[in-house]
Amino acid sequence: SLSGTYNQITQAGIELIGYRSLKAEWACLSEAGKICRTLGLTHLTLELSDAQFVPQILRTLQLNDAAADAFQTAFFAKELSTYQDLIAPLATNPLYPFLQQWPWLFGDSETIFAELKRLLPSNVITDRLAPLQQTVAFLKDQFPELRVTIDLTSRPPQSYYTGIFFHAYVDGGHQYLFSGGRYDKLLASFQQELLPAVGLAFDIDAVTDQLPNAPDQPLTFVYGLPSQWQAAAA
């Protein structure tokens, strides 16, 4: 039943299907950046995450299913006391220094990458972080005015995301202007052959809320007889 609340979102978006290359993410983000630039949406922050980062760390820790589920629940819910209890038995694991800092690994991209380089084995950096690093470098080259942050502590907004996911907002804004990511298994319910896909969607209401109000145009009144309508309308 309907609750009576306004729960509709007007969106406009981009979807690229069939491209496994990281350039698909770049193409979507580039178009979104150009749109924001054209609309004069400045002071924009783009936050990047990776849907596979948490699963890879859990595989590296070799936790059983029950322990992995408890770990993810506490981690994503920011239940830090429970999280600390769960990582305590891993004190001798090489990843333990990373696990201690993990809940706070979000913020400026350069700072986060420096911390990860210090805390993680090089193979993890290469496997999962290289696409994020390359994407940050691309964005800073194409959109130097853009603030790019990394968040490796957030749950993907949809379970079907399989790689990089992202959202953008302006300083002081309460809504995402656009969001999206890679979802290579979304079409699994409709066909046997999986197609890689990347997409993003703009929240039209959030975008229009950030646009400057158009200046009032002066009204011009033209008086005339009905027979003079065409001349008056011209």
Q: What function would you assign to each model-found segment?
A:
Residues Q62-A88, V170:
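Acidic, His- and aromatic-enriched active-site or binding-groove loops in soluble protein domains
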Residues T45-S49, Y223:
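Short internal beta-strands
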Residues S1-L41, I87-A234:
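Positively charged, Gly/Ser-enriched RNA/tRNA-binding surfaces
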Residues P55-R59, Y161:
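A short acidic (Asp/Glu
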Residues Q8-A12, L48-Q56:
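Short, conserved phosphate-binding/catalytic loop or strand-edge motifs used
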